[in-house]
Amino acid sequence: MQLQYFLLIAAALFCIGVYGLVTSRNAVRVLMSIELMLNAVNLNLMAFSNYLDPQEIKGQMFTIFVITIAAAEAAVGLAIVLAIYRNRDTVDMEQFNLLKW
């Protein structure tokens, strides 16, 4: 397949993630939107790696690294959301400003 197809799909995924990030007030949906944006970046990394030098695996290695970091970020984010839900009985983003006190 051509590079343009992968770039269009990645751009669409990234735009959907940004839309979800901006419009959602639910913390779990915000985390899912961030993960969708990271997956769009991973798709770009894989596409450019395959397009520029198909014999090298640097892009694939970096993509696996980003997936690992995203999994850790999701685990920490969900742990924080779960702790706030236990204390406040809501996952509304407006209630997260209570972390300031």
From Swiss-Prot:
GO CC annotation terms, alphabetical: NADH dehydrogenase complex; plasma membrane-derived thylakoid membrane
Enzyme nomenclature, EC number: 7.1.1.-
Cellular compartments annotated: Cellular thylakoid membrane
Enzyme class label: translocase
Topology within the bilayer: Multi-pass membrane protein
Single GO term (MF): oxidoreductase activity, acting on NAD(P)H, quinone or similar compound as acceptor
Transmembrane segments: 3-23, 30-50, 64-84
Reactions the enzyme catalyzes: a plastoquinone + NADH + (n+1) H(+)(in) = a plastoquinol + NAD(+) + n H(+)(out); a plastoquinone + NADPH + (n+1) H(+)(in) = a plastoquinol + NADP(+) + n H(+)(out)
NADP as UniProt keyword: yes
Keyword entries, A-Z: Membrane, NAD, NADP, Plastoquinone, Quinone, Thylakoid, Translocase, Transmembrane, Transmembrane helix, Transport
Protein family per UniProt: Belongs to the complex I subunit 4L family.
UniProt-listed HAMAP family: NDH1_NuoK
Subunit field text: NDH-1 can be composed of about 15 different subunits; different subcomplexes with different compositions have been identified which probably have different functions.
Known function: NDH-1 shuttles electrons from an unknown electron donor, via FMN and iron-sulfur (Fe-S) centers, to quinones in the respiratory and/or the photosynthetic chain. The immediate electron acceptor for the enzyme in this species is believed to be plastoquinone. Couples the redox reaction to proton translocation, and thus conserves the redox energy in a proton gradient. Cyanobacterial NDH-1 also plays a role in inorganic carbon-concentration.
Name of the protein in question: NAD(P)H-quinone oxidoreductase subunit 4L
Organism: Leptolyngbya boryana
